[in-house]
Amino acid sequence: MNTQQLAKLRSIVPEMRRVRHIHFVGIGGAGMGGIAEVLANEGYQISGSDLAPNPVTQQLMNLGVTIYFNHRPENVRDASVVVVSSAISADNPEIVAAHEARIPVIRRAEMLAELMRFRHGIAIAGTHGKTTTTAMVSSIYAEAGLDPTFVNGGLVKAAGVHARLGHGRYLIAEADESDASFLHLQPMVAIVTNIEADHMDTYQGDFENLKQTFINFLHNLPFYGRAVMCVDDPVIRELLPRVGRQTTTYGFSEDADVRVEDYQQIGPQGHFTLLRQDKEPIRVTLNAPGRHNALNAAAAVAVATEEGIDDEAILRALESFQGTGRRFDFLGEFPLAPVNGKSGTAMLVDDYGHHPTEVDATIKAARAGWPDKNLVMLFQPHRFTRTRDLYDDFANVLTQVDTLLMLEVYPAGEAPIPGADSRSLCRTIRGRGKIDPILVPDPAQVAEMLAPVLTGNDLILVQGAGNIGKIARSLAEIKLKPQTPEEEQHD
């Protein structure tokens, strides 16, 4: 980036010229790392801390960011401001040291809000589909030559990064409702994909509180802003009269302003028509499977159409869409002869979905695209509270696969809850009489326990939000083949 470009970018956020050094506590999180990446490319001195390296920290270190793999008071020395993720507790040594040194400590969303303040902000919120929709909007704007800045919660595969600094006036960002921090954002356009009960500890277990928080988020739009909302979602339909801003609705519903019609899935692609008010219909080929992704695309098209982006750019972007990391992510197709001696192959797909609605959408996409495949799921429940609160929903959804292997619950810092564990969930599913789940007590046993259930015409879904993504990549690296003791020792 040359000096003239950097000066232009720094002028976008004039008040932040007083800030020299920004330190991120929990920098390895996708949301934190994305903001750090944008700020590093804007020319700020960035440092951060986390407990272990990962692809996010490696990408940042490649940009010259200093990262400490520990949490120590001295890490915040000389910082102008400390940015903290919601996963970091108030007694973290770096947070304590920052307060003692009178260094401002702000949440991730507050920094994102500063980046958005002097740009045309487009924020994507909702219980499900945020990451993919953010990537779709970003892809369309990039294809149209608008060079947007984007900050996403997942890897945008076409760009190879979670975030990118553009030279245009647009900032496209995933908005996180999990800790209600999206209330800091003041975008020009907001998408709400759906609203379901999740992260209810943030909302005191009160769904009305969650709904009102989404309304408050939309009221951060200026009176001339626009809310783009999925009218198929019953909660959104209920809330529409309370939005108080210009709205565009989308969905399969007949009264949607942007309506999906004639949906058909062929393998990994969706084909459908979009009907828009006062515009010609367009026939879309979307390089992403599932009716849920058609809805995500409809949201992106609604925003792009409002901005005046031409249909050709929209259609090119959706047909060439490369997806996001861990969202129906194809990791390969592997011959089974070395795995269990059988002929044929098994496809391996990695997916982040960890709420029953998301898991259901992934299963439906797999069934629609590959109806003849033996559907095998390796599932890792995420959080004891979510497993408890959505226990019956999980039990119902998980019976839809042909074979289910289940890892222990990924705690995400939570204490175990009696009856909300994987063994109990397996027992409940088994009692329904449709499938016989297999509990995998040790992640090291996954390949060994997976091999015998593969038939030679399989689609393996590795599903969950904990550390199961690493397990998926490991399975791809070993091509599903269980390792002998000698091979493990060599590794």
UniProtKB/Swiss-Prot annotation:
Binding site for ATP: 126-132
Leading EC class: ligase
Gene Ontology molecular function: ATP binding; UDP-N-acetylmuramate-L-alanine ligase activity
UniProt main location, coarse: cytoplasm
Compartment(s) where it occurs, according to its Swiss-Prot or TrEMBL record: Cytoplasm
Transmembrane segments: none
InterPro entries named among the record's database cross-references: Mur-like_cat_sf, Mur_ligase_C, Mur_ligase_C_dom_sf, Mur_ligase_cen, Mur_ligase_N, MurCDEF_pg_biosynth, UDP-N-AcMur_Ala_ligase_MurC
EC number: 6.3.2.8
Pathway entry: Cell wall biogenesis; peptidoglycan biosynthesis
UniProt signal peptide: none
Coiled coil, from the record: none
Reactions the enzyme catalyzes: UDP-N-acetyl-alpha-D-muramate + L-alanine + ATP = UDP-N-acetyl-alpha-D-muramoyl-L-alanine + ADP + phosphate + H(+)
Pfam families named among the record's database cross-references: Mur_ligase (PF01225), Mur_ligase_C (PF02875), Mur_ligase_M (PF08245)
Keyword presence, Glycosyltransferase: no
GO cellular component, one term: cytoplasm
Keywords of this entry: ATP-binding, Cell cycle, Cell division, Cell shape, Cell wall biogenesis/degradation, Cytoplasm, Ligase, Nucleotide-binding, Peptidoglycan synthesis
UniProt xrefs under SUPFAM superfamilies: MurCD N-terminal domain, MurD-like peptide ligases, catalytic domain, MurD-like peptide ligases, peptide-binding domain
Biological-process GO terms, alphabetical: cell division; cell wall organization; peptidoglycan biosynthetic process; regulation of cell shape
Lineage top rank: taxon: Bacteria
The keyword Cell wall biogenesis/degradation belongs to this UniProt entry's keyword annotation: yes
Function according to Swiss-Prot or TrEMBL: Cell wall formation.
Record family assignment: Belongs to the MurCDEF family.
Protein name: UDP-N-acetylmuramate--L-alanine ligase
Species assigned in the record: Shigella dysenteriae serotype 1 (strain Sd197)
